[in-house]
């Protein structure tokens, strides 16, 4: 019984140490998620506004900008996957990778060759384990991305888009990330960012008149300035959405792990108490048995 009791106590110490770690990670994620959520709220209007601005300029002009023009015979598509650098985030990265696999399959059904760009160690490990090629990866900033890091990603993707497909370039760029809906809800989402899909409408806007635009110096110059900013803003917003979603997922996962650890501690404590009680009972039985034996010996 003594050996069994030692095993239970050792397990209790081990689980309690793990619970301290998961509890600390839960508190860290909870403290960071507020700021991450604020950054998402702050960046989303800009990303949507610059998308509308680019769409308006494109629809009001006759400029065939290379970042807007659909390729006549697309050959290759790039897929950017936004995953996490660390674990203990539940199914956060797995959901993005699953959405990425579905998008890849859809693109291949269209006859396109698909190349992948990865953000986050989890996504990179997934592709390396399966011996799949990755054009480029970025690591170390999934929880706290900056605009400069988003610009670096955007520059690489724009360069690939501006390169002819025969020279290894791409004809389409898609991004797969996790959209932050609320603290409890985050959903994987795939979006095509290049070429930009210009939405034209015949519905009259509020006020009954369509806005008239004048471009200085010209429409092509405006698009040259806006389109790279549009790609950067979209990727930056995807990174921020992913960071907030990762922290929310980590908070939930660590809370569940802490709760499970506490339940396991209670279970092992009951088992240890039962083992200790059985040990004491056995010791008492041995003492009583020994006393009875002495009494019996003395009476003889």
UniProtKB/Swiss-Prot annotation:
<keyword id="KW-0139">CF(1)</keyword>
<protein>
    <recommendedName>
        <fullName>ATP synthase gamma chain</fullName>
    </recommendedName>
</protein>
<dbReference type="InterPro" id="IPR000131">
    <property type="entry name" value="ATP_synth_F1_gsu"/>
</dbReference>
<comment type="subunit">
    <text>F-type ATPases have 2 components, CF(1) - the catalytic core - and CF(0) - the membrane proton channel. CF(1) has five subunits: alpha(3), beta(3), gamma(1), delta(1), epsilon(1). CF(0) has three main subunits: a, b and c.</text>
</comment>
<comment type="similarity">
    <text>Belongs to the ATPase gamma chain family.</text>
</comment>
<keyword id="KW-0813">Transport</keyword>
<dbReference type="Pfam" id="PF00231">
    <property type="entry name" value="ATP-synt"/>
</dbReference>
<dbReference type="InterPro" id="IPR023632">
    <property type="entry name" value="ATP_synth_F1_gsu_CS"/>
</dbReference>
<keyword id="KW-1003">Cell membrane</keyword>
<dbReference type="GO" id="GO:0046933">
    <property type="term" value="F:proton-transporting ATP synthase activity, rotational mechanism"/>
</dbReference>
<keyword id="KW-0406">Ion transport</keyword>
<dbReference type="GO" id="GO:0005524">
    <property type="term" value="F:ATP binding"/>
</dbReference>
<dbReference type="InterPro" id="IPR035968">
    <property type="entry name" value="ATP_synth_F1_ATPase_gsu"/>
</dbReference>
<dbReference type="GO" id="GO:0042777">
    <property type="term" value="P:proton motive force-driven plasma membrane ATP synthesis"/>
</dbReference>
<keyword id="KW-0066">ATP synthesis</keyword>
<dbReference type="GO" id="GO:0045259">
    <property type="term" value="C:proton-transporting ATP synthase complex"/>
</dbReference>
<dbReference type="GO" id="GO:0005886">
    <property type="term" value="C:plasma membrane"/>
</dbReference>
<keyword id="KW-0375">Hydrogen ion transport</keyword>
<comment type="function">
    <text>Produces ATP from ADP in the presence of a proton gradient across the membrane. The gamma chain is believed to be important in regulating ATPase activity and the flow of protons through the CF(0) complex.</text>
</comment>
<keyword id="KW-0472">Membrane</keyword>
